[in-house]
């Protein structure tokens, strides 16, 4: 009996020693390796960017196909299974365009074909409130061509607001006050970072997402399509012609305008002419003709090792490739960072790293026209993605300048903070990115993903997938112009390409933790706190209107309890582990808990979507109705409040109350998912 016991004991010791001797390094080893200088390569990043930006490569062009081939070649050279998914989407290109006072062959994607001749009215940034100001001044916009400046809202909303005000055409220019480095002895590119007076910001004026001829379904070959006339009825494309123009032409037109002097906050820099509202007497002739074509390619690759754990759970990294011009900042700084991530992962693979979950790398096309490549792919794969994707990690323009910026769905806030604590600030070697990001505050400012500005939109706002978006710097003066090239990046954006390397480090580190950790690093307590803040803000907006927010506050309270409970469950499972976990792990329990964490975000969506904007299913985050770039919390409630304030009827406020109940039910559904119990 004693001999048997000794044999068993010796066997246990030997087996344990063997396990320790031959077990792979801990995940933390690979995390440190990933962000080390041994794997990062700023020279390679620079070479990627230089190759990608040799030619302007708008979506559907031969140059963009070459850029796609380059991305694919890098991915395949890393021994990753890669492929291209193609979609036949409707894109527009200029056939002819003319405007007295301007010569540059610039255009608006999905701009309306047509001509417009009329007196000019200056409308500041073209916001709804700017038209209210003009109305109060007695300025009639009807029948005019408006002159607006970039800077506050999405250009498509500028054109839409002009149409709603009765204008017959729209010109949008880049004012030196906003993009040209100010006045006096100001310098511009190539001597400084600022947009030259000849610079033109091009872009799309489409207010929707995805191919406008296939709303809600994928643009596959031979699929159903709605007609151009039906597209116009949706209100997502402009109904008046528009053109972007440079500041030098904007000022020439401005000098032709008389009438009342515009308000002080509508004026330009001190060297600009006096800005007046008009109308006229200057009259402009604007004509624009487009052709449509069908084209789109999305190179994608899988990085996966099928093991016994969770190969059917996906962590997706995405960036778009197409650019209006050379695209050194937007978007190919992000593309170069994506390729840097890929090459680091290959080096880690050679050192024994294997992910627990599948990592999927995507390089989207036609983002600039309206998030088209990512949206079509999401629409085609909706059910699979909804059931299997853990998180979508987006980087659009990786580097604009200095300073780290991030936006996320709130359950990922803590993970972002932890990742930035591990990566050195490229502009201050004595600090981590987190320390520079926080600055003098107690906590970093993390934005939210309600705006429609990049490829996270379909993942978050349509399906309800947790997501992150990140960059260094926020906005750059040569945005969407011919000056967004490699020289600008090398001189003013990232001299040594260390910011690119830092973005790749944070991006990949977040992905590694999501792909490798046994428990998904989600914390829904952050979500509950964020909803509480948003509800408090909403309380001020509906004060005295007879609206009860009690259902909303109660649902948030339940979410706090559910988030606390699932956090405690994770701790209990970890606490119960020990040497026994070497022999047997309860994989089903871990899997079930992770599924609850993954699926909870989906419960914030509603199958009916937002009223009048049914593609947007997420009831917590969606774009502002009058600014596609603007992020709103509780967008359905906010839309209803805006409508009620305009209509001033009891029935309209009942609609607000209904929207409050809808959001409250969604928050309760999230709590049920986290609790993992049927009612």
What are these regions (language model features)?
Residues 24-34, 38, 50-145, 150-152, ...:
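Noncatalytic luminal/extracellular "stalk/propeptide" segments of secretory-pathway proteins
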Residues 101-133, 207-328, 343, 348-351:
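Soluble metallo-hydrolase cores and metallopeptidase-like ectodomains found primarily
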Residues 193-261, 312, 364-490, 496-500, ...:
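Metal-dependent peptidase/peptidase-like ectodomains
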Residues 360, 476-534, 645-679:
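His/Asp/Glu-rich mid-to-C-terminal helical/loop segments that flank catalytic regions of hydrolases
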